[in-house]
């Protein structure tokens, strides 16, 4: 119980600290660029046309809504984080209880030791089920978080309170409105998890020497590196999910010119791929203007 409480508190603290970062990231993902590009230099010293980074973008938001405005959407995101942690823990706890029941039921019969690969498959499958359950239950809060952020673009106040936002979505879109963008989000999470754990297994098994004294440390490093690599590869799923969550919801940021009305998440994916925007919002620093794009001052976006 104390373990779960500490996880919730730690997660909530990290959520609060990272809220301004997520706010900026979401607005960039939608395509909103309130500040014109400037001429700067990249890491190799070459002159490039750069878009404002995280700090300039955050400063712009604070100049309009104050520093408190940087924490728009925090309440539903905290609810999502707390509920997700609890659900994730409960699902894993259920699997642990099932294992104990099997062990006690088998009596003194010696269980066959499973291979490390089988163990990875088993643990990854359980983690996938736990994450999927948490994502499914918390997605409505995720949708509200995104929409409350995106309304900054049109200066709307449609999604302000948690209860009012729930009522608005249900009234206008029904139950399905709470799960806009769920499928690409689930797919991205699942692919990222399996990719991360599979790569970590291969690295730990075939690339690292088991005789090294710091083996456990090396394994934790490899897990972190493969996790970062997997998240980079599956970023398009995150982008598509977030865009579908705000698409055609009555906000300026979810309608043309910032986004066409997508018929499905696959349509959104194809459109982004065609425009070369699959990595939009992936980087918050050293953001250069993509080749062939120009900045439109009136629309505050790249066209």
Swiss-Prot record:
Q: Which ranges sit in the Cytoplasmic compartment?
A: 37-77, 157-180, 253-280
Q: Where in the cell is it found?
A: Mitochondrion outer membrane
User: Which Gene Ontology cellular-component terms appear in the entry?
Assistant: membrane; mitochondrial outer membrane; mitochondrion
**Residues that bear N-acetylalanine:** 2
Question: PROSITE patterns, from UniProt?
Answer: SOLCAR
TM region(s), chain numbering: 16-36, 78-92, 136-156, 181-199, 232-252, 281-303
Enumerate the Solcar repeat regions by residue range: 2-98, 118-206
- Which residues are exposed on the Mitochondrial intermembrane face of the membrane? 2-15, 93-135, 200-231
Q: What does this protein do?
A: Protein insertase that mediates insertion of transmembrane proteins into the mitochondrial outer membrane. Catalyzes insertion of proteins with alpha-helical transmembrane regions, such as signal-anchored, tail-anchored and multi-pass membrane proteins. Does not mediate insertion of beta-barrel transmembrane proteins. Also acts as a receptor for the truncated form of pro-apoptotic BH3-interacting domain death agonist (p15 BID) and has therefore a critical function in apoptosis. Regulates the quiescence/cycling of hematopoietic stem cells (HSCs).
What family name appears in the similarity comment? Belongs to the mitochondrial carrier (TC 2.A.29) family.
This protein's name = Mitochondrial carrier homolog 2
**From which source organism is this entry?**
Bos taurus (Bovine)
């Amino acid at each position: 119980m104390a373990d779960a409480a500490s996880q919730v508190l730690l997660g909530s603290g990290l959520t609060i600290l990272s809220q301004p970062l997520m706010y900026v990231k979401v607005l960039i993902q939608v395509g909103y660029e309130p500040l014109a590009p400037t001429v700067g230099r990249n890491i190799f010293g070459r002159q490039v046309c750069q878009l404002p980074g995280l700090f300039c973008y955050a400063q712009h938001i604070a100049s309009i809504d104050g520093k408190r405005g940087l924490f728009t959407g925090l309440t539903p995101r905290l609810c999502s984080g707390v509920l997700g942690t609890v659900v994730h823990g409960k699902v894993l706890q259920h699997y642990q209880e099932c294992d104990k029941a099997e062990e006690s039921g088998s009596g003194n019969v010696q269980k066959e030791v499973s291979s490390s690969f089988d163990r990875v498959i088993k643990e990854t499958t359980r983690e996938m089920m736990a994450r999927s359950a948490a994502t499914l239950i918390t997605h409505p809060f995720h949708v509200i978080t995104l929409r409350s952020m995106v309304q900054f673009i049109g200066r709307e106040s449609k999604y302000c309170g948690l209860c009012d936002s729930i009522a608005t979505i249900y009234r206008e879109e029904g139950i399905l409105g709470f799960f806009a963008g769920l499928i690409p989000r689930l797919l991205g999470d699942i692919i990222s998890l399996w990719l991360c754990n599979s790569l970590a297994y291969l690295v730990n098994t075939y690339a690292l020497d088991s005789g090294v004294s710091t083996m456990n440390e090396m394994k934790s490093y490899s897990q972190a590196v493969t996790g970062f690599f997997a998240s980079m590869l599956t970023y398009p799923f995150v982008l598509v999910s977030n865009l579908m969550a705000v698409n055609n919801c009555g906000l300026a940021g979810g309608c043309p010119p910032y986004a066409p009305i997508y018929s499905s998440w696959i349509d959104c994916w194809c459109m982004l791929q065609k425009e070369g925007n699959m990595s939009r919002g992936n980087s918050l620093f050293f953001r250069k203007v993509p080749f062939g794009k120009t900045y439109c001052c009136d629309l505050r976006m790249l066209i």
